[in-house]
UniProtKB/Swiss-Prot annotation:
Protein name: Uncharacterized HIT-like protein ML2237
One GO MF term: catalytic activity
Disulfide bridge partners, by residue number: none
Superkingdom in the source lineage: Bacteria
A GO BP annotation: nucleotide metabolic process
Residue span(s) of domain HIT: 4-107
Sequence motif Histidine triad motif, location on chain: 91-95
Cross-referenced InterPro entries: Histidine_triad_CS, Histidine_triad_HIT, HIT-like, HIT-like_sf
Length: 134
């Protein structure tokens, strides 16, 4: 059965995409730890990061680095946080989010009900930042 991320990638469910190529996509999470919290996901369904083909994992990491630069620029952040948790959705994904503090590295701090407007604004800011970086 397809994961929720595969359904988002295939446009069966909505997603706020900020990056996409043949192997990897990046879209905003619906439960951000900070504004601009983005998920970087391989298009292929791979459950655990340690089982992914090294070439695909390299692409996921390269896109995560690009998204990290984008979220830092978009939100004037000191750093980009990165987490590979491996729970909730059985499809490899890397959390990339703008941060100024180690205290942001907690899923207990997520916004469980962000406004659609704030997510749309974050998407626009990240896409603009990525365009500037290109």
């Amino acid at each position: 059965m397809a994961t929720i991320f595969t359904k988002i990638i295939n446009r069966e469910l909505p997603g706020r995409f900020v990056y996409e190529d043949d192997d990897v996509v990046a879209f905003l999470t619906i439960e951000p730890m900070t504004q601009g919290h983005t998920l970087v996901v391989p298009c292929a369904e791979i459950d655990q990061w340690q089982n992914v083909d090294p070439a695909i994992f390299g692409r996921v990491i390269a896109v995560s680095q690009l998204i990290g630069k984008g979220v830092c620029r978009a939100f004037n952040a000191e750093r980009a946080g990165v987490i590979i948790a491996g729970f909730e959705v059985p499809h490899l994904h890397i959390h990339v989010f703008p941060t100024h503090s180690l205290s942001n590295f907690s899923f207990a701090n997520v916004d469980r009900n962000p406004s659609p407007e704030s997510l749309d604004a974050a998407q626009d800011k990240i896409k603009a930042a990525l365009t500037q970086l290109a």
